[in-house]
């Protein structure tokens, strides 16, 4: 789905360029630009469980880590006039990528800082990740060699993981870390998904010197709606959580060189973070068909870093 979206965005300028001459001023030179990039995605996703009846202390945390997943990224920007532009962008992983997951529990309220149970799952995969972004920019400062804009937009991002096999250390029958073992290699243990809906505001700008151009962007949101789905296959249990008004921060920097007046090659780095916040969670136990709901019983966090190299072409 996301790959198709990128293809549509990148093909749009070709369609526009074939319109009648009467619209040539509106779609003329320096009015539409497209970008296509290849790169990698690395990051970590965290899910937490809290116990409201024990003062909201943390009783469980799962850390999902991945590195260098191949991604395809694209964008199209349309300058409606010299001071206003709209854009669409997105990226998607090209295939799954190996990772690692660590699951820790703190079940003894008398020693809340010491974990009692831990499992490690080196056979973990990032199944997919993707994002789309729609935005509008107002260029309040625009000179021949630099410009600056405020922007507002909406983006959504999704992540999916599976953990298979692994080893464990449990505290059983009143003992402390007294039971160890390994799960069969082919047993799917946990599946996890995150979904974020992010309205944001920010700043963006660039500076050009001869054929070199440098740019950056900053995004902020305090209105993120996050949700996740945690499937414990062995226990036949599903956890679903929702968090509202999370904080989101993103910083992007890029540097490029114009090989022709219309074409620029460039590299870019983007760091993004969704900070942890408590939300409501629901548990569904399929072994006995029971369920329960807890307010402020879950926490969701995500951060990642994207590096890409690509081409920008202006029509």
UniProtKB/Swiss-Prot annotation:
Membrane topology of the entry: Multi-pass membrane protein
Function: Protease; also acts as a receptor for bacteriophage Ox2.
Pfam families associated with the record: Omptin
Alphabetized InterPro entries for the sequence: OM_adhesin/peptidase_omptin, OMP_A26_sf, Peptidase_A26_CS, Peptidase_A26_omptin
Protein name: Outer membrane protease OmpP
Family membership noted in the UniProt record: Belongs to the peptidase A26 family.
A single GO BP: proteolysis
Class of this enzyme: hydrolase
Active site, renumbered: 103, 105, 230, 232
Organism per entry: Escherichia coli (strain K12)
EC number(s) from the headed UniProt entry: 3.4.23.-
PROSITE patterns in the record: OMPTIN_1, OMPTIN_2
Main location: membrane
GO cellular component, as recorded: cell outer membrane
Leader sequence segment: 1-23
Domain of life, source organism: Bacteria
Keywords: Aspartyl protease, Cell outer membrane, Hydrolase, Membrane, Plasmid, Protease, Signal, Transmembrane, Transmembrane beta strand
GO molecular function: aspartic-type endopeptidase activity
Subcellular location(s) of the protein: Cell outer membrane
């Amino acid at each position: 789905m996301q790959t198709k979206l990128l293809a549509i965005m990148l093909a749009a300028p070709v369609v526009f360029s074939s319109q009648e001459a009467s619209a040539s001023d509106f779609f003329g030179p320096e009015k539409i630009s497209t970008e296509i990039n290849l790169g990698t995605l690395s990051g970590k996703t965290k899910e937490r469980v809290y116990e409201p009846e024990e003062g909201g202390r943390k009783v469980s945390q799962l850390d999902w880590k991945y590195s260098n997943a191949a991604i395809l990224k694209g964008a199209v920007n349309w300058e409606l006039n010299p001071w206003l532009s709209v854009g669409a962008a997105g990226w998607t992983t090209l295939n799954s990528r190996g990772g690692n997951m660590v699951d820790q529990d703190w079940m003894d309220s008398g020693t809340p800082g010491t974990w009692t149970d831990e499992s490690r799952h080196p056979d973990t995969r990032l199944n997919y990740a993707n994002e789309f972004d729609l935005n509008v920019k107002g260029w309040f400062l625009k000179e021949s060699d630099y410009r600056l804009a405020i922007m507002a937009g909406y983006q959504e991002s999704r992540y999916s993981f599976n953990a298979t096999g692994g080893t464990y250390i449990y505290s059983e029958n009143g003992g402390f870390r007294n039971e160890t073992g390994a799960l069969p290699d082919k047993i799917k243990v946990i599946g996890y998904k995150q979904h974020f809906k992010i309205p944001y505001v920010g700043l963006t700008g660039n500076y050009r010197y001869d054929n070199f151009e440098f740019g950056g962007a900053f995004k902020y949101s305090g209105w993120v709606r996050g949700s996740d789905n945690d499937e414990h296959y062995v226990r036949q249990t599903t956890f679903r959580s929702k968090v509202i008004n999370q904080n989101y921060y993103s910083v992007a920097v890029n540097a490029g060189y114009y090989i022709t007046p219309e074409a620029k090659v460039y590299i870019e780095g983007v760091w993004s973070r969704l900070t942890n916040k408590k939300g409501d969670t629901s548990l569904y136990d399929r072994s006995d068909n029971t369920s329960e709901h807890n307010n402020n019983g879950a926490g969701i966090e995500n951060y990642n870093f994207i590096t890409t190299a690509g081409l920008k072409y202006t029509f």
